[in-house]
């Protein structure tokens, strides 16, 4: 992994139902490689879960969704958690943030159910994506071209 010193990452979640490893592991990885990481949420504290149903720790976010956008950040990370994403994908602030990142052609990384936000924000059409197999139909119905890969980068315009 390249040195990320001087780079800034924004991680956004709704609050309840965020998968703890999908939030904390990317944050730790980015920090270990030099990135500044901001965690923003719609609610405070963030009530994490594991396995979508087992309560885990609470995390205090750095900012609210209303306080952040694409400006000042190099990458957006969207962790999963079924309940987290079911709420985040209908959140107008999350839509605004996603559209800002896409319009600025900045990197976006979605984990597990994270691509639901791309669909609901209206930025999926014609892009390629991978996801958990159980999300495939949602991704295709949302306008994505789904590919069966462990990780995938869509280099299309915008």
Segments (PLM) and residue ranges:
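Active-site-adjacent pocket-lining segments in enzyme domains
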Residues: 2-46, 58-158
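Charged, often glycine-rich, active-site loop that binds/positions anionic groups
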Residues: 51-59
């Amino acid at each position: 992994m390249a040195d990320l010193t001087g780079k800034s990452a924004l991680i956004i979640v709704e609050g309840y139902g965020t998968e703890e490893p999908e939030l904390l592991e990317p944050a730790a990885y980015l920090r270990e490689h030099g990135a500044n990481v901001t965690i923003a949420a719609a609610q405070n504290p963030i009530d994490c879960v594991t396995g979508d149903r087992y309560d885990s720790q609470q995390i205090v976010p750095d900012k609210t969704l209303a306080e952040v956008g694409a400006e000042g950040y190099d990458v957006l990370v969207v962790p999963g958690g079924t309940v987290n994403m079911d709420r985040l994908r209908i959140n107008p602030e999350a839509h605004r943030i996603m559209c800002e990142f896409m319009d600025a052609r900045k990197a976006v990384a979605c984990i597990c159910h994270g691509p639901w936000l791309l669909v609901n924000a209206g930025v999926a059409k014609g892009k390629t994506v991978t996801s958990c197999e159980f999300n495939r139909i949602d991704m295709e119905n949302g306008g994505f071209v789904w590919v069966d890969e462990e990780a995938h980068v869509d280099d299309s315009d915008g």
